[in-house]
Every structure is written in structure tokens, then in C-alpha cells.
Amino acid sequence: MSGTIPHFWAQPFRYIRWSAREKPAYFYSCVIAGLGPVFLTVVPPVRKYFGDVNPAPIPVTYPIPTGPRKQLTGYDDDTEEA
């Protein structure tokens, strides 16, 4: 184990190496978080290059049929006039 903990602003590369060994969860979570903005700019063109398209949106309403509706008979509906 090293003697003293390096300070980030004094020795940034030494601090990064130290944190990768001593606190890997924090180190790799910062690495993944730092790659987020890069992925936002790189991934969409790569998806488009490989032909991946977004799926059609899921319908949120029932489609209304076109044309007139059929009048039902024989189900005790003759009391209601449309």
C-alpha cells in the first residue's frame, strides 16, 4: 500500500491510478458516467449506419372503424331508436 493518498489537483494521473486500485466502484462509475455524453453523440449515427430503426409507436387509442356502423337487431335493442 502506498504511503500517502495523492491529491487530485496536485497529481491527477497518480490519483486516477490510486482510485482505480483502492476505490474501483467509484472510479468505474465515474468512467461510465463520463462516457454518457460521448455515447449520446456516437450511438445514433452508428445505429443508422447498421440499419437499426426505431419501432413504430405503440397505439394509445383503439382505431375507429371507417364507414357506417351496422345496426344490431335481435338483442332487445329495438326499444332504443338511434
Swiss-Prot record:
Residue ranges crossing the lipid bilayer per the database entry: 25-43
Keywords recorded for this protein, A-Z: Electron transport, Membrane, Mitochondrion, Mitochondrion inner membrane, Respiratory chain, Transmembrane, Transmembrane helix, Transport
Disulfide pairings: none
Cellular compartments annotated: Mitochondrion inner membrane
Membrane topology value: Single-pass membrane protein
UniProt KW Transmembrane helix keyword: yes
Cellular-component GO terms for this entry: mitochondrial inner membrane
Function comment: Accessory subunit of the mitochondrial membrane respiratory chain NADH dehydrogenase (Complex I), that is believed not to be involved in catalysis. Complex I functions in the transfer of electrons from NADH to the respiratory chain. The immediate electron acceptor for the enzyme is believed to be ubiquinone. This subunit binds ubiquinone.
Quaternary structure and interacting proteins, as annotated: Complex I is composed of about 40 different subunits.
PANTHER family per the UniProt record, alphabetical: OXIDOREDUCTASE 9.5 KDA SUBUNIT, PUTATIVE (AFU_ORTHOLOGUE AFUA_5G08980)-RELATED
Family per similarity comment: Belongs to the complex I NDUFA3 subunit family.
Protein's UniProt name: NADH-ubiquinone oxidoreductase 9.5 kDa subunit
Organism listed in the record: Neurospora crassa (strain ATCC 24698 / 74-OR23-1A / CBS 708.71 / DSM 1257 / FGSC 987)
